[in-house]
From Swiss-Prot:
The gene is OR8J2. Gene3D superfamilies: Rhodopsin 7-helix transmembrane proteins. One of its GO terms (molecular function) is G protein-coupled receptor activity. Odorant receptor. SUPFAM superfamilies: Family A G protein-coupled receptor-like. GO terms for cellular component: membrane. Disulfide bonds join C97-C179. Glycans are attached at N5, N265. Residues 46-57, 119-143, 227-239, 293-315 are cytoplasmic. This is Olfactory receptor 8J2.
Length: 315
């Protein structure tokens, strides 16, 4: 108990996707299926890109890390969400909430920059295939991934520290299905200028920088493809980046839908629906996008299923 008879929050209550009792079991089943598909699909991509000799290229190196990020991002959110569908008391501890926010920020920022790195990789592959192995060398790949995770950790530590530096002493009901910065700050009983500024700066900078890389890469990809004289060559060049282009449009489209809404139409309920998409739906879609449209991945899956024991020994 603090001065002024204010009770400091020690746990939060997550409202969830819906507070309708009749929808809890149906929603549990839907999201359980989504999570199991996420685990199976992304573990499949991780395994194939780790064991198959034909997939030891920069493109599949980045794809493996994207699958790891998607799997981890869903795992930060989904298990607690699924449990809350089945229990009456939908609480999460203060420190558990801080850990969930930090984990979510790490992996969502990592996904943003991994997609940007993959766009650069596709640009180099189409723009200068002869220099591809030199420009996007294993050392460069490791450096890009290391910088991605470093920026993700910096963002997560800074933003989550700012969000939990303010006081929570009134309502503890979060209108969300996981601990996110905006609905948390809406509950604060102290000045939120610093954490709101930190959220704005980091989210804006990360999103803007990665989008610039993606847009410049794809602008140059389109220019390069248009300069190819044969229709067969253009089709082959386009097919090498089609899967990534679809993933980028789906992911950034969801984020832009959430961040570019007019203030008058903005609501936490709308944010929840967008969050469902990029925390639980996109991690299911990415393995499908990259496998169904990718002959190399489909061939690798066939080789793995023909002799899984031999393939696993190559890990």
């Amino acid at each position: 108990m603090a001065s002024g008879n204010l009770t400091w929050v020690t746990e939060f209550i997550l409202v969830g996707v819906s507070d309708d009792p009749e929808l809890q079991i149906p929603l549990f089943l839907v999201f359980l299926v989504l999570y199991l598909l996420t685990v199976a699909g992304n573990l499949g991509i991780i395994t194939l890109t780790s064991v198959d000799p034909q997939l030891q290229t920069p493109m599949y190196f980045f794809l493996r890390h994207l699958a790891i990020i998607n799997l981890c991002n869903s795992t930060v959110v989904a298990p607690k969400m699924l449990v809350n569908f089945l229990v009456t008391k939908k609480t999460i501890s203060y420190y558990g909430c801080a850990a969930q926010l930090g984990g979510f920020l790490v992996f969502i920022v990592a996904e943003i920059f991994t997609l940007a790195a993959m766009a650069y990789d596709r640009y180099v592959a189409i723009w200068s295939p002869l220099l591809y192995a030199v420009v996007v060398s294993p050392k460069v790949c490791r450096l890009l991934v290391s910088l991605t995770y470093l920026q993700s950790l910096i963002t997560a530590l800074t933003v989550s520290s700012c969000v939990f530096s303010v006081s929570y002493c009134s309502s503890n009901i979060i209108n969300h299905f996981y601990c996110d910065d905006v609905p948390l700050l809406a509950l604060s009983c102290s000045d939120t200028y610093i954490p709101e500024t930190a959220v704005f700066i980091f989210s804006g900078t990360n999103l803007l920088f990665s989008m610039i890389v993606v847009l410049i890469s794809y602008f140059n990809i389109v220019i390069t493809i248009l300069r190819i004289r044969s229709s067969e060559g253009r089709q082959k060049a386009f097919s090498t980046c089609a899967s990534h282009m679809i993933a980028v449009v789906v992911f950034y489209g969801t984020l832009l839908f959430m961040y570019l809404q007019p203030r008058s139409n903005h609501s936490l309920d709308t944010d929840k629906m967008a969050s469902v998409f990029y925390t639980l739906v996109i991690p299911v879609l990415n393995p499908l996008i990259y496998s169904l449209r990718n002959k190399n991945v489909k061939d690798a899956l066939k080789r793995f299923l023909d002799n899984p024991c031999r393939s696993l020994k190559l890990m």
